Amino acid sequence: MQVSVETTQGLGRRVTITIAADSIENAVKSELVNVAKKVRIDGFRKGKVPMNIVAQRYGASVRQDVLGDLMSRHFVDAIIKEKINPAGAPNYVPGEYKLGEDFTYAVEFEVYPEVELQGLDAIEVEKPVVEVTDADVDTMLETLRKQQATWKEKEGAVDAEDRVTIDFTGSVDGEEFEGGKASDFVLAMGQGRMIPGFEDGIKGHKAGEEFTIDVTFPEEYHAENLKGKAAKFVINLKKVEERELPELTEEFIKRFGVEDGSVAGLRAEVRKNMERELKGAVRNRVKSQAIEGLVKANEIDVPAALIDSEIDVLRRQAAQRFGGNEKQALELPRELFEEQAKRRVVVGLLLGEVIRTNELKADEERVKALIEEMASAYEDPSEVVEFYSKNKELMDNMRNVALEEQAVEAVLAKAKVSEKATSFNELMNQQA
C-alpha cells in the first residue's frame, strides 16, 4: 500500500492510496471461494460448483464488493499509520480500475484542529455570593399567591397589575393594518406583551370609557411595514379586574405538599427549593464565565463537518419542541442554527482538550451526587435514583455532565476567580 497526504485547505486533507494488484486479486479469489461454498446452481451440489462458473456468474459483483472493502480498510490503515484524526465522514474518490493493475483512489476529509490551550491564567471569573433571605422567601410566597389568585371585577381606574378586557382598532396614517384589530381581548397589565406605550395609555382609565392612544412601533418590530411607524389605537375598555390573593390557609399550603399545613412548613419548603435553584444558578453563572473566557483565549479552526452535524442535532431538537417531524426539521434554515452550532463545537473541542491534558475521568461520587441533587426535586427521590441506576444511557449522560463540570473546575483552578455579593433576584434574573 502506497500512501500520500496533502492539505487541501485549512483543515481539509486528501489522502491518496494505491492498492497493489496482487492484493486485490488475492482478496477476490478468497471471497469467490467463500461464495462457492454457499451458492446453489442447478446441476451442481452445494459447494461443488466449479470456480470458473462461480467467477463467471459472481466475479463482477464480488470484485466490486472487495474493492469497496479494501478501500475502507486501507484508508483506516493509512490514517493510523499517518496519525491522522478525521472529523466527520470521509468522501471516497475512486480512480479508474483496470483488471490486473494497481488501483489508486483518494479520500477527502477534514481533521480535528490541533488545540494548544493558552491564556487560562488570564480568564477572569466573578463568583456570585448569595444567600436566600427572609425577604426573598416573602417575595416568593407573594409570587405563589399571585399564581393562585382569582380575578375580581373592580370599578376603579386601571392599575399596573390589573387585568383588562378591551376592543381595539389600530391605524397608521389613518389606515387600519393587518393584525391591528381585536374584540374582547384580555390583557394582563405589566407583562410587556404589547408594544411600548400601549399599556401606559390604558392605565388610569375606567371600564366603559372609549379613548385613543398614540404609540410608535419599535424599529425591531417583526412586521416590516410597521417598523418605526407612529400609530393610533382606539380603545374600548370593557372590563377592569384586580387580583384577589388567597390567604395562607392550611388548605392553600397543603397544595404545595406541606403536610402539616403550617406557614412555617411552607416557608421551609420554599426556602429549600430556592436554595437548590440558587446553587444551580451560581454553578451555571461561574461555568458560563469560565467557558466564555476559554473560548475568547483560544481561537481555533472548526471542521465544517462537525458544524453540519451539530446543526442537524439542533434542527431535530427544535422540531421536537414544536411538534414537528424529521422531514420538517431538515427543512429549517441552517442559518437559524449555524452560530449556535459553531459555538457548541468550539466549546466541545476546548473542553475535550482540557479533559485530555488533565487526564480527567468522570468521578462516580460526583455522578451520584448530581443524580441525588436532581432527584430531590421529585416527590419520591429514591425512585428517580433507582431509575437512573438501571438506565445505562441516562447514567452515561450524567457522567458526561460530571466530566464537563470537572473540566470547568480545571479551568477555574488556573483562572482569576473573585467573589461578588449579589441578591437572589439579581442572580436569577441574569439566568432568565
From Swiss-Prot:
Domain of life: Bacteria
Keyword set, alphabetical order: Cell cycle, Cell division, Chaperone, Cytoplasm, Isomerase, Rotamase
Reactions that this protein is recorded to catalyse: [protein]-peptidylproline (omega=180) = [protein]-peptidylproline (omega=0)
Gene Ontology biological process terms, A to Z: 'de novo' cotranslational protein folding; cell division; chaperone-mediated protein folding; protein transport; protein unfolding
EC number: 5.2.1.8
Keyword Isomerase: yes
Location of the protein in the cell: Cytoplasm
Cross-referenced InterPro entries: PPIase_dom_sf, PPIase_FKBP_dom, Trig_fac, Trigger_fac_C, Trigger_fac_C_sf, Trigger_fac_ribosome-bd_bac, Trigger_fac_ribosome-bd_sf, Trigger_fact/SurA_dom_sf
SUPFAM superfamilies: FKBP-like (SSF54534), Triger factor/SurA peptide-binding domain-like (SSF109998), Trigger factor ribosome-binding domain (SSF102735)
An MF annotation (GO) of this entry: protein folding chaperone
Residue ranges constituting the PPIase FKBP-type domain according to the UniProt record: 161-246
GO-annotated cellular components: cytoplasm
EC top class named in words: isomerase
Matches recorded under NCBIfam families: tig
PANTHER family reported in the protein's UniProt record: TRIGGER FACTOR CHAPERONE AND PEPTIDYL-PROLYL CIS/TRANS ISOMERASE, TRIGGER FACTOR-LIKE PROTEIN TIG, CHLOROPLASTIC
Described purpose of this protein according to its UniProt entry: Involved in protein export. Acts as a chaperone by maintaining the newly synthesized protein in an open conformation. Functions as a peptidyl-prolyl cis-trans isomerase.
Record family assignment: Belongs to the FKBP-type PPIase family. Tig subfamily.
Name of the protein described by the UniProt record: Trigger factor
Taxonomic classification: Bacteria, Pseudomonadati, Pseudomonadota, Gammaproteobacteria, Enterobacterales
Name of the gene: tig
